[in-house]
Amino acid sequence: VAKELIKYPFVEKIDVVETDKMFVDVCRKFFPEVACGLEDPRISMYYDDGLRFLRGKNDEYDLIINDSTDPLGHTEGLFTKEFYGSCYKALREDGIMVYQHGSPFYDEDEAECRKMHRKVYKSFPISRVYQAHIPTCPSGYWLFGFASKKYHPLNDLDAERWDALGMKTWYYTTNLHRGA
């Protein structure tokens, strides 16, 4: 995620929180195309649990992206009501949180998606789910979550402002945004 964010010159600061330093070291060594950019001066690396990292942070972030694995083992804390409440507090008044929501394709996973959305909805006044087709994910059909204190992902979309940036992206377009 950080690799993509550093492409935008207006991004001033990125805090990357990873529980496993060895994972990052292995990626740097064997998958440099994935780990590239981590030396960018705008990036600060923290090796910590995401929930513990966010506790006590208030009004600090414009955007929180949770690109966690499944809610198993050491990442379970990133799928709790406490975590989403901590994200809410850590975001500025106009901040946005986006996160992996999983695949609703299989019955058990679909139930987890619903459970997760209910937890987020209890913390954020605006909480929506969007979809993408990602062939490398189980079932190829994946959901993501959008949560905000202020912005609705469709009603507040400023397509003209985005288009005026002239940003060339591989996947995202404002039409796709509306359709997802």
PLM segments and residue spans:
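The AdoMet/dcAdoMet-binding core of the Class I SAM-like
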Residues: 1-94, 106-113
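Alpha-helical structural signal in soluble globular domains
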Residues: 4, 8, 119-123, 149
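Residue-level detector of family-conserved "landmark" positions at structurally sensitive sites
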Residues: 16, 38, 101, 129-130
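Active-site-proximal loop/turn and secondary-structure-junction residues that shape catalytic pockets
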Residues: 70, 103, 133
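Conserved Class I S-adenosyl-L-methionine
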Residues: 84-88, 110-133, 145
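Conserved beta-strand signature within the Rossmann-like core of class I S-adenosyl-L-methionine
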Residues: 94-101
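Soluble small-group transferase modules, centered on the S-adenosyl donor enzyme superfamily
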Residues: 126-180
